[in-house]
């Protein structure tokens, strides 16, 4: 696997230990963002209680006649957030997509609101101020707008990886600078942040990630002047290379 070749630049034995690769990854960021933006009560409750949504997805598809593992179910769990439907899927899988909108009525209602906004104003706007233009959007005979997949997808992806992840990067970088650390940010992939950790700074860097995680609500609220009533979670993994990172307890 390619990730195994990514190791710390501080890989000598000068200090009796080697540098580490740390990956700080948001837990179910898009689902949490969808819960926040839609204020769906069921989704908010599941986020708050740590409900295992992937196992639930597997259960729905399996009960519809297609035995499915939790890992296999992951491909479907959040797909409706991005505009995916049951079209072109097996009958059992399609059952889950219908079930999703029945279960998360607040998200379904929010999707409709976004569609109406796009038709009436030619654009949609999210709480950060980010806007997406749809100048040629029209209402189909079915009542749904054209470009509906993008209309449903952009707010979730935009607020999650376009608005939240960048400010977290800034907060991590600011704290690294304040402590005058050699450790540095080296990469981001979707909703995860990768750092190269100096061998003498592991405790400091883990402390920074914990501090950012503990203050995520305030960080987002201060940047975008919104009320964040859905918990966000930044989890850390660390190891000798990017592939072999382990959860930080």
Per-region residue spans from a language model:
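Conserved catalytic core of nucleotide polymerization and phosphodiester-bond processing enzymes
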Residues: 1-249
């Amino acid at each position: 696997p390619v990730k195994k070749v990514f190791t710390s630049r501080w890989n000598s034995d000068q200090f009796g230990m080697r540098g580490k690769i740390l990956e700080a990854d948001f837990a179910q960021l898009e689902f949490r963002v969808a819960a926040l933006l839609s204020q769906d009560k069921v989704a908010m409750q599941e986020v708050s209680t740590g409900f295992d949504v992937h196992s639930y997805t597997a259960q729905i598809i399996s009960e519809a006649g297609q035995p499915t593992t939790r890992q296999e179910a992951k491909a479907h769990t959040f797909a409706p957030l991005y505009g995916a439907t049951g079209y072109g899927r097996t009958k059992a899988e399609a059952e889950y997509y219908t079930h999703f909108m029945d279960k998360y009525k607040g998200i379904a209602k929010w999707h409709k609101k976004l569609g109406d906004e796009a038709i009436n104003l030619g654009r949609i706007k999210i709480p950060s101020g980010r806007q997406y233009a749809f100048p040629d959007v029209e209402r189909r005979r079915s009542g749904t707008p054209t470009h509906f997949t993008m209309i449903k997808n952009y707010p979730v992806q935009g607020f999650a990886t376009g608005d939240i992840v960048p400010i977290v990067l800034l907060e991590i970088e600011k704290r690294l600078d304040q402590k005058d650390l050699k450790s540095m940010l080296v990469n981001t992939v979707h909703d995860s942040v990768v750092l190269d950790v100096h061998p003498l700074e592991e405790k400091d860097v883990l402390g920074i990630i914990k501090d950012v995680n503990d203050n995520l609500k305030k960080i987002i609220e201060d940047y975008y002047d919104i009320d964040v009533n859905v918990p966000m979670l930044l989890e850390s993994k660390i190891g000798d290379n990017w592939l072999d990172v382990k959860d930080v307890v």
